[in-house]
Amino acid sequence: APSALTVQAEEADAAQTAEVSGVEYQIYPTPHEMTYQDGGFDIGEVNIVYENGVDDVTKNRMTEVLSIKGKSESAAVTNAKVDGKTNILAGIYGSDGYVDKYVKEHYTVDKSLFDHHGSYFLASNKGEIVILGLDTDAVFYGITSLKHIFNQMDGTTIRNFEMRDYADVNIRGFIEGYYGLPWSNEDRMSLMRFGGDYKMTSYIFAPKDDEYHKGKWRDLYPEEELAKIKEMVKVGNDSKCRFVWTAHPFMGGFNQAQADQEIQALLRKFDQLYDAGVRQFGVLGDDVGSLPRTIVINMMTKVSEWAKKKGDVDRKSVV
């Protein structure tokens, strides 16, 4: 026969489950699909399974989320589910890895979900949480949704649910390109961290108080200024609201008679910033004026070729 303590524990679990059944979580941007199931469970000692394609930044996000409920330090990382623990599985769709196979075997997820930008499946179900993303960034977005939920949970009890979500546009973020009071670097980094909490992808750096973006776009940054760029790049990488460096060459006296040399100067500048860790670049063309379009086309062709040779530059240029 069960002991009095066992009965009390079961009654407490039942009360928690009943209480959480009416909970609905507020997540922004609003997920495309969120369905709730009856009941929930208490998050106990955590076991995490990561597939190989999940990057360190995404793992760090998981640690951050677990720390909200004091679960990060005791969490273990293994290669498979562990009985008696709260298992959190994070993997990539189509990888044929442990999590990819597990989700296909235990959940119903239409493959068309993964035709969309940043798509992921997130489920909380009877002692386990699973995140299956289109890529490691999408897994990060799923864990970020979990962060929203953890911040709203009363205690460590989470409701059973399934979420299917994706982005309607590929580039999501903000640009600093106005002529008013400039932001400080602390402002910029704070905004990237904020953007990372809302699944933004990009902070487009185009401040008009930075002469090396505008009037001195040909000139390399001094080391002191480059160090500041490196710091912002790191925050962008860590938040996945990535730092996008742009040049404004057509406002800065572009010499069309020496267009080839001007383009080479721009690529040298890009090389310097690439070495500083920047992997997203843009060219602002809003002041192109009467410049022959063939020059602009040639510039962007050369920029695209440069990015392709680098191999790891995001080739979505901003024009």
PLM region descriptions:
Residues 108-109, 113-285, 308:
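Feature activates predominantly on carbohydrate-active enzymes
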Residues 318:
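Conserved small/polar residues in nucleotide/adenosyl-binding loops
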